[in-house]
């Protein structure tokens, strides 16, 4: 099994195959609208604008598992991000990243970088995936998106 075998849900709950992103460099991030790290949306958007034409996609998965910091609906979250941070990368449906209801994609990501018991510790944990679908790096929530530039450039 690899990352392209998974299905994810868009903002409207419609299933999409991860294979849609074959050949792209991915930053997969769990986010929240009321978190101390929420201003990282700005840095994520800068990365997206800088590298999108070279093949970068940012996949934003809101998550309400950490201190109820993403209580809004999927649509409200997407609107918030677009309004306050001018995000243009794709926001997906809200998911769980830990526990028995953790999204299968996140179970896979954690297993690839951190081991099966390596729980997501907070919002804005970022995974970097190469063009072949390999999970190559995991960045802690406190790592600002701009600090990922070199790692992204190496994969582009």
What residue ranges belong to the model's regions?
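Chalcogenol-based redox active-site neighborhoods
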Residues: 1-156
